[in-house]
Each structure stands twice: as C-alpha cells, then as structure tokens.
Amino acid sequence: MQQEQSISSQNLSDSRLNRFGFHSKKPSDSAYYKAFFSMYPLLVLQNVVTLSVNLADNMMLGAYGESALSGAAAVNQIQFVYQCLLTALGDGLVMFGSQYWGKKQLSPLRKIAASAMHFGLLLSAVLFLLVSIFPIQALRIFTTDSAILEQGAQYLNIIRFTYLFFAITQILLATLRSVEIVGIAFRLSCMALLVNCSINYLLIFGHFGFPQLGIRGAAIGTLTARILEVIVLLVYLFRSAGKKLGLHFSNYFHVDPVLTKDYLKTTAPMLVTNGLWGVNTALQTVILGHMTAAAIAANSVASTLYMLIKSTAVGASSTASVMIGKAVGSGDIPLTKHYSKLLQRLFLCIGVLSG
C-alpha cells in the first residue's frame, strides 16, 4: 500500500513538472549543462558587443586625437553608471519574469515587464535632464582640462539622446531573456556595432566625401546605432516573439501596483549595489582625470579590456537568473537547490578561466 502511495506521489510530481514545461523525469545534469551553455555564450557575446558600441568610439577616436578620446572616455563613464543601473532593472525583471515563465503565467510577466519599462524610462529621463542642464558640471567631475571638456561637451550634446533608446532596448531584451529568447540580443548588438563603426569611419575622419566631424561624428554613429536597435527589436518583438508572450504595445500602459511593489522591493538593493559599483569604476577616471590627457586615455584602454573580461561573469549571472528563476517557478525546490549547486561549480570554473 505504501509502495502504491509512493508511486502515485511520484506520478503526481511528474505531472506537476510537465505542466510547468519540464520533462516527466528529472532532467540529467548533462541536460542542465547543455541548456546553460546554449544561452551562456550568446549572452557573453551580446554583452561584449553592447559594450563595444560605445567603446568603438573610444578606439576609433584614439586615432583622431588624444583630447577627443579622453572626452569620449569621460562621457562614457556616465554611460557605464547608467548601464549598471539598467542592468539591475533588467535583472530584477528576469528574476520575476523567469519564475512566471516557469509557471506558464504570462499575464503577471507582462505586468512586471511594464513596470520595469516605466522605471527604465524614468531613469533615462532623469539622466537626460541632468546632463542637458549641467553638461560641463557633469564633465568636470572627471577632468578639468579645458580641451577635454570642450570635446566631451560636443560628444555629450549628441550622446544624451541615446539614453532613451538604450533603456528601451535593454528592458525589452530582459523581457525576452525571461522566456529564454537570447539569440536576437547578440544579432542586434552585432548590427549596432557594424552600423556604429561604419558611420564612425565616415564621419570622424571624413572619408568618401563625408564631412570630417571628429568626436561629433562618433556620437552620431552611436545614436544612429541605438535608434536602429530599437526599431529592429520592436519589429521582431511584436511580429514574432510577441506571439510567444502575448505581448502588445498596450500592455505597457497597464501596471499592477502589487507586482510593481514586489519588483521594486527586490530590485532596489540591486540598483544600489550596481550603482555603487558603477560609481566606484567611474571614480578611477575622476582621479586620473585630474592628471593628464594621456593618463585618461591609458585608463580608457585598460578599462576596456577589464569590461570585456567581466562580460564572462555578467553572462554567467544572466544565464543563471533565467534557469534558476524558471526552476523556482516550477515549484520544485529540491531540484532548484540541486541546480544552484551545479551553477556554483560552473561559476568557479568560469572565474578561474577568466582570471
């Protein structure tokens, strides 16, 4: 009798897992590793290429002039802090969204996505206003060199318009990541990098009869790339992936106060920690910025290498948040704990290899 109850209980457990998208049998460790590495490389590459869109300006301006390179590097420190905050908003969305995806409950997922988008747009608006009203004051945080300030102000005057588009892109990509759609992010970033580098080549140096705009040309390239990112992503989302989510433009006008409160409660600590990390990194430029243009330029190159290597860790955490969130949403706590132990081993290996 006890054996029959045990078998019945097991069958019930298997049935429950099936409802949430798992196989009737416990997935093997190898299957879990396979699922992890099907997403991980794409997320690492996507993060690398996303960083490269702004870093391409730094690299190509290095051949144009030291002051232009240093001016762009100073502005991109603001972008880095902003990106850290948007990453926190996106990670919070993935934490909640992947759980609802595991439960196959799409309605609350869409409402969480709407809340995240509202906070992202608010953040972009605040930053836009600050750098529009206090452009020189913002740049003086990083340097007092008049030539660098002049170049940085030209760059910031255009690059500030990218903040809105970047926020929309990052929140939409986090929404897709919640439901295990990651390939589009990498392809989108590659497109943005190609567009940015092409326009930089034409407008920074004035090739093929185009005007030589210097640092303004680099900013125009980045702005164009960010706008194209949003356009392509919106078309993809509402024509293809939107069907999987049941997502429509009107969904972003409706938020759930209870879900928004839960989202903010979880995301607020990440906003603080990510923001502090971004500020900590920017402070290095602040210190060097009161030295020479050469010091800022050298730090820009070193920081570029560091951020590219750091992408391996960012990709790992992004992948883990999706997979653990989905497992939590399935309601199988023992399986979730088992998966977390597997991830700890993976993180150790990734950390050693990255080092």
Model features per residue range: what roles?
Residues M1-L43, G97-L164, Q212-T267, I324-G355:
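Short alpha-helical transmembrane segments in multi-pass integral membrane proteins
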Residues Y33-S52, A56, I78-L85, F161, ...:
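Residue-level signal for short hydrophobic patches within transmembrane helices
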Residues P41, S52-V53, L89, L130-F134, ...:
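Residue-level signal for transmembrane alpha-helical positions in Major Facilitator Superfamily
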Residues N47-L51, C84, S124, F128, ...:
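Residue-level hotspots within the lipid-embedded alpha helices of multi-pass solute transporters
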Residues V48, S52-S70, L139-S146, L202-L213, ...:
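Helix-terminus/linker motif at the lipid-water interface of multi-pass membrane proteins
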Residues L69-S132, F166-A185, T285, I296-G355:
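Small-residue-rich hydrophobic transmembrane alpha-helices
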Residues G90, I159-S178, A185-N196, A218-L234, ...:
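Short runs within selected transmembrane alpha-helices of multi-pass transporters and secretion channels
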Residues V131, A174, N200, I204, ...:
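Structural signal for membrane-spanning alpha-helices in multi-pass inner-membrane proteins
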